Regions:
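Anion (oxyanion) recognition and catalysis
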Residues: 41, 109, 162
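Periplasmic-binding protein-like
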Residues: 14, 21-29, 84-89, 121-122, ...
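Residue-level detector of anion-binding/catalytic polar loops
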Residues: 23, 46, 83, 114, ...
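Flexible loop/turn connectors
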Residues: 116, 134-238
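Glycine-rich phosphate/diphosphate-binding loops that line cofactor/substrate pockets in enzymes
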Residues: 74-85
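Hinge/beta->alpha junction and helix N-cap segments in small-molecule ligand-binding domains
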Residues: 1-9, 52, 62-72, 88-134, ...
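Alpha-helical recognition/docking segments in bacterial nutrient-uptake
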Residues: 1-75, 135-141
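Residue-level signal for nonpolar/aromatic packing positions in well-ordered secondary structure
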Residues: 25, 47, 76-77, 104, ...
Length: 238
């Protein structure tokens, strides 16, 4: 297992791969160094990317179905009576985050929402929890229904809005993505899209084995179903 934060980390990781003669690599970071993936392909090491943009030939990808998740979020907020919407994400974003935002915009538009007028892109100066908290402080008029790119942003936004005296779902509704353990805690009770980590892991290992058996096969992308978990910040609507 390796974490790469610098060019030195990248060089060290590549040396370790050569030293231990690894038989396969799974890249899980939201923004993994492309040089690492390309070098593995060059050395004929099978690579599977998880939740990353499918762009490199000879690499297989396993991704949560971000577009379907965004549609579930749009449907939930519309059924709940929301008419003004917000999208919260960092800039620059991971590929998965960008895909979720673009799909959310499309889903609203195809359901009759004027996205030029009724969809706000909320400013998020930093990543993670702190970024969500800052976005809440910077937000002017708060949209009725907000979709967040990930759970950390959503939790930070919830706490930031509490500091402004606003609560979900009384003052606005909020849906996150990831369903990490903190989202189920009593203080958050975040309605969120659930990524099936076990299914993603199984598919990644299967693709790795298949790539090792047939290195020249075309690249494939597997989309893993996501589900909407209803909690307090956007309750279930019949």
């Amino acid at each position: 297992m390796s974490e790469i934060h610098s060019e030195q980390d990248l060089a060290h990781t590549l040396r370790r791969f050569a030293q231990f003669r690894v038989s396969g690599v799974i890249v899980t970071s939201g923004q993994p160094p492309e040089a690492l993936v390309n070098e593995c392909v060059h050395q004929h090491i099978p690579v599977v990317g998880i939740n990353r943009q499918p762009t490199i030939p000879g690499v297989d990808y396993v991704c949560s179905d971000n577009a379907a998740g965004a549609e579930l979020a749009a449907d939930q907020l519309l059924r709940s009576g929301c008419r003004r919407f917000g999208w919260l994400n960092t800039h620059p974003s991971t590929w998965a985050g960008r895909m979720r935002g673009e799909a959310f915009s499309r889903a609203l538009q195809t359901r009759g929402v004027n996205i030029e007028r009724d969809l706000a892109h909320l400013a998020c100066p930093e990543e993670g929890y702190v970024g969500g908290e800052q976005a809440a402080a910077l937000a002017g008029e708060v949209p009725e229904g907000i979709f967040c790119a990930n759970a950390q942003l959503a939790c930070g936004f919830l706490d930031g809005m509490r500091q402004r005296g606003k609560q979900a779902p009384e003052d606005y509704q909020l849906i996150g993505f990831d369903n990490t353990p903190p989202t189920a805690q009593y203080s958050y009770q975040l309605t969120t899209l659930h990524q099936d980590v076990a299914a993603i892991s199984r598919q990644a290992l299967t693709r790795l084995q298949e790539r090792a058996a047939d290195p020249l096969q075309p690249s494939r992308t597997t989309w893993v179903e996501v589900t909407l978990i209803h909690r307090r910040t956007s309750p279930f609507v019949i």
